[in-house]
Amino acid sequence: MTQETYPSCSFPAHPRSWVEIDGRALRFNIRVARERIPKKTKIIAVVKSEAYGHGLIPIAKELVHSGVEVLGINNIDEAIELRQAGIRSALLILCPILPSEASIIVSYNVGVVISSYNEAKWLSQAAERQGKKAIVHIKIDTGMGRLGFIPSQFIQEMEKIKRLSSLSIAAICTHFSQAETDIEATEKQWLELLKFRHYFKGLPIHVANSAALWRKSVYACDYVRIGLALYGIAPMPFLRRFLKPILTWKCKIVLIKELPRGHPISYGATYKLKKPSRIAVLSVGYGDGYCRSLSNKASVLIKGKRCPVRGAITMNLLMVDITDLPSCKVGDEAVLLGTQGKESITADELAKLSQTISYEIITNIHSHIRRNYRHFLSHSNELSLYE
């Protein structure tokens, strides 16, 4: 089977560690999300930060091919990359912009979620110079404490924004801070937003992230913003049975050693063998995005069995105990994240061991790690990102 390449990407021609992305699972998760929302509701698929580490362009193309209406991004650089890749769908920058970016944002026909009058002014001025209308979504800070207009100042600021002649207000939105964990706090934010709905005379609303989508159906308004669930990672444990993770991270055994009882493993001698052991050295480390905090905690899958990580994870290598797998040899595959046989290692599992969140686990996978895309309908052939 031939492979499509992306010349702008630089990946090892002979990778020792790589990621496989399953297009079938991605489409399955899109269908699951569609089943949760009314037919009129549009999806804003969040593809910022390289589509949560999965690869911006291939994921975006597959989402558009699958009917997703809007792509949510971090900044103008991502917008330019998408436009240059031939994607003409609606784009929405979710984060604050700088004044120097306003002109190019308007020229590329990109919407912006704004949290200040200044952003609105910069965009309106740029749009006026170009004879266009700048597209904005107005965010209200109902409890997140990050972006959005403060409710007590909102009406005053909006009166100023409405006087900007080259601005098109496309929607009103907010962002839930505790949709995964606190139903009451989420409902409080929702009710805070509704206080201002009359002010917009029927403008579209979006509030729901992946977690909120499964909290209450009323949160699925005119748009829903879905990120984590698209990639098959459950924002809440009960959702795991509904979603399919689309990413598998693999590497290879590069060395096998027989070591005696009491032998130290890796920097700092943080682990000493409790018995004579067979140790495999794997071709991945924290320099590739595999968290050092997983040292002496995580396992990897080899031949469908869990093999514990021993010692400190190093920049490009880690060690695992394969004493119970005598048939292992150099070159065998190891699964760092994903399924092999009947065993699975999830992003949630690694996040818990690292005392972080699943978002960080997947976005940490370094951009130099080769991504192989399988069963993607937006491309005629299996494609692999490499030089």
UniProtKB/Swiss-Prot annotation:
GO BP annotation list: D-alanine biosynthetic process
Pathway(s) it belongs to: Amino-acid biosynthesis; D-alanine biosynthesis; D-alanine from L-alanine: step 1/1
GO annotations of cellular component type: cytosol
Active site: K48, Y267
Residues binding substrate: R146, M315
Sequence positions bearing N6-(pyridoxal phosphate)lysine: K48
Cofactor(s) this protein cannot do without: pyridoxal 5'-phosphate
Domain of life assignment: Bacteria
EC number annotated for this UniProt entry: 5.1.1.1
Keywords, sorted A to Z: Isomerase, Pyridoxal phosphate
A molecular-function term among this protein's GO annotations: pyridoxal phosphate binding
Reaction equation(s) it catalyzes: L-alanine = D-alanine
UniProt entry tagged with the keyword Ubl conjugation: no
Protein task: Catalyzes the interconversion of L-alanine and D-alanine. May also act on other amino acids.
NCBIfam families in UniProt: alr (TIGR00492)
Similarity remark: Belongs to the alanine racemase family.
Protein name: Alanine racemase
UniProt lineage: Bacteria, Pseudomonadati, Verrucomicrobiota, Methylacidiphilae, Methylacidiphilales
Gene behind this protein: alr
